[in-house]
Amino acid sequence: MPQLTKSAELFELAKKFIPGGVNSPVRAFKSVGGTPIYMAKGEGAYMTDVDGNTYLDYVGSWGPFILGSMQPRVTAAIEYTLRNIGSSFGTPIEMEIEIAELLSRIVPSIEMVRMVNSGTEATMSAVRLARGYTGRDKIIKFEGCYHGHGDSFLIKAGSGVLTLGSPDSPGVTKGTAADTLNATYNDIESVRLLVNENRGDIAAIIIEPVAGNTGVIPAKKEFLVALRELCDQEGIVLIFDEVMCGFRVALGGAQELYGVTPDLTTMGKIIGGGLPVGAFGGKRKIMENVAPLGSVYQAGTLSGNPLALTAGLETLKILMEEDPYPELERKAAFLEAGFRENMQKLGLNYVQNRVGSMACLFFTETPVVDYKSAITADVAKYGKYFHSMLDQGIYLAPSQFEAMFTSYVHSDEDLEKTVKANYNALVAAHQ
């Protein structure tokens, strides 16, 4: 068991000045219990905490580090920009055009794109754009999907909202809640019912094509195809939230993987290379409604800043040059097979969901295809499992309802260590 003396001291101090002692709720370890761990350094596939303990990292800053932490080329590019260009100007820069052109080549749906500073900004802006474009007010989202902390999305949400056991948030007005309709993930009839009941009022349907904030739940291809057809029939804007799965499950994201093209796409995480960034883009006829070309307002002081764009550009260039996706698939499949073999040895039959290098081990035997099946997972057992893995030097998400990310820099030795630790942790979860 790692000694966490300094982490405990820092957490007590933090609680005096920061709500709950953290700047994002899931970091507080409320779901799994214990002391939140304060990290001091990350490099490659490893992190070291303030007490000197080292961990094999499967959180990857919640998704951005597909190439590992402190990737040498990305780090060098950031340093060059900081020393020779600057951190921000509040003016247009050439780099904005470079990344916009690159994204339009990589992501099937993107003809025009606007850079922002976070995934939340991207999804909020995309929904506002859809409303402005259609002249309609209501949106459909899916139970358990998380699209950031915008008011419209905190109705039956996933991620930290679900982790804390309350899928709704106080502070969301009744009017906002009334304009947010929730359907069942992977259930097209639930969507059709809402559309029929609100015909002519639905501006957008927003979905994570690989839901990564209720554990990991892949959409069925036929479900996405049906959504596309329904949106075309009803004049509804289809938004894919690819903040997490974009550039992760395939270079062109889930829309490339599934062969289904949305009207708008939101992005983040990997396109910032570990720095704060987001983007939304899509069909030209819709994006031309964004100010200053159109009347749908969106702005940001640090949007398109050189540091974030540098990190994102270098990350995308590496992904294009090295094509890590077959290797990521091999590594993640090795873990999945190893975990399955361990469960067979122990007479367990828990569910594993995986799409590429995004995965989740659910402590339930119920197939997980939506929010209701996800919450059948035994959170207490996951907490024991988490702490056993932590004791063995493996850092997982401190929540049953988050993804496990395999990175390009996880070595075969790292993977073997993880499979061995998984066996011990499964035993510990049942003691």
Curated annotation (Swiss-Prot):
Identify the cofactor(s).
Answer: pyridoxal 5'-phosphate
The entry lists its GO molecular-function terms as:
glutamate-1-semialdehyde 2,1-aminomutase activity; pyridoxal phosphate binding; transaminase activity
Which locations, inside or outside the cell, does it occupy? Cytoplasm
Write the record's keywords in alphabetical order, separated by commas.
Chlorophyll biosynthesis, Cytoplasm, Isomerase, Porphyrin biosynthesis, Pyridoxal phosphate
Question: Where mainly found?
Answer: cytoplasm
Q: Please name the GO terms of the biological process aspect recorded for this protein, alphabetically.
A: chlorophyll biosynthetic process; protoporphyrinogen IX biosynthetic process
Quaternary structure note:
Homodimer.
Query: What family is this protein classified in?
Result: Belongs to the class-III pyridoxal-phosphate-dependent aminotransferase family. HemL subfamily.
Q: What is this protein called?
A: Glutamate-1-semialdehyde 2,1-aminomutase
Source organism per UniProt: Chlorobium limicola (strain DSM 245 / NBRC 103803 / 6330)
